[in-house]
Regions:
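Non-catalytic cap/lid and distal C-terminal segments of serine-dependent acyl enzymes
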Residues: 1-314
Length: 314
């Protein structure tokens, strides 16, 4: 259902974009419910013969396009993308922004097939099979609908925080699809859910309430149950054929300046080192985006611009 907030977001972007922002009500067979997906179309898309495709992942579909998602930003991610295209700094890029949370944004699927499916389809999570929603429903639909314009373009994904985790999962569990994966302050898993800083069980993935909707309550979780959804383990234990496919994706990872309550620097550093250990290209050498970088939308939006400029002009 398109809400007043969706309409307000569309109204803002109608006057601020040279391209167009639309809401696609998408019926998912995997979820058994409809999900709203924001789609950004670059300027003059009807007359384009070729363009690139960018998926944006975080939580609720509004987050990349809602100016008041926090108090740090003066433009939205899509306004920044539109400006880069309109100024000729990057070629035309279409963006697809699926929601990964409940309708109220409070319960996060993380983009996986839930270990604890929702019992109430009214919350928007449906069956909880979000991995199937992404890889069996949404991606094939987008590829088929825009096939004539996407034939020669890059496939990109970018994610912030938990969306960074989802981006890494697409790149490692759906290997070979993405050409580039951009991740800002990603909430990465450690191998076997053991925090390398403390040699103790991971406080986020095994003990916190953050992943409850997808993983169930903390007392039911185990490293073994999470292994199929752990990008670190998918990299470390990949067979040779799968590793070659993962190596087709170039990763671009930066973090906030701090860790703990201030960001995910250590997790980003860990995952970048793991990629390089296995011959997977990581495009940035320095992990913190800036000495003042924070876990906010302003800094994520700065990262997205840097990521795209490096992909297309670096």
């Amino acid at each position: 259902m398109i809400t007043p907030l969706h309409r307000n977001i569309l109204a803002r972007h109608k006057s601020s974009l040279n391209g167009a922002l639309r809401v696609l009500p998408f019926r998912s067979r995997a979820l058994g419910v409809s999900r709203n997906v924001f789609v950004y179309e670059p300027p003059n898309m009807r007359n384009l013969s070729d363009m690139h495709l960018l998926y944006l992942f975080r939580g609720h579909e509004r987050e990349f396009v809602y100016i008041d998602e926090d108090d740090s930003r003066s433009t939205t991610t899509i306004e920044d993308l539109d400006a880069l295209i309109s100024s000729g700094q990057i070629p035309p890029v279409m963006a697809v922004i699926p929601g990964l949370t409940s309708i109220d944004g409070k319960r996060h699927s993380m983009g996986i097939n839930s270990l604890l499916p929702s019992a109430d389809t009214r919350d928007g999570l449906g069956s909880g099979q979000f991995w199937d929603f992404l890889t069996l429903d949404l991606i094939p639909y987008v590829e088929a609908r825009y096939q004539s314009k996407l034939s020669g373009g890059f496939r990109l994904a970018a994610g912030f925080s938990l969306g960074g985790y989802t981006t890494a999962l697409i790149a490692t569990a759906f290997p070979g699809y993405l050409d580039h994966a951009g991740i800002y302050d990603g909430l990465f898993m450690f191998d076997a859910q053991t925090d390398i800083r403390t040699n103790a069980p991971d406080e986020i993935w095994l003990k916190s309430a953050v992943p409850d909707a997808a993983l169930g309550p903390a007392e039911t979780r185990s490293p073994e149950a999470l292994a199929p959804w752990n990008p670190a383990e998918l990299v470390r234990y990949a067979d040779p054929v799968t590793m070659e496919e993962i190596q087709e994706t170039m990763f671009w990872i930066r973090s906030a300046a701090g860790d703990g309550l201030e960001g995910n620097h250590d997790r980003c550093k860990y995952f970048t080192a793991l990629l390089r250990e296995h011959g997977i290209t990581a495009g940035f050498n320095r992990i913190p985006l800036h000495p003042d970088a924070r876990h906010t939308w302003h800094w994520n939006d700065r990262f997205i611009k840097l990521f795209l400029l490096n992909v297309f002009t670096g």
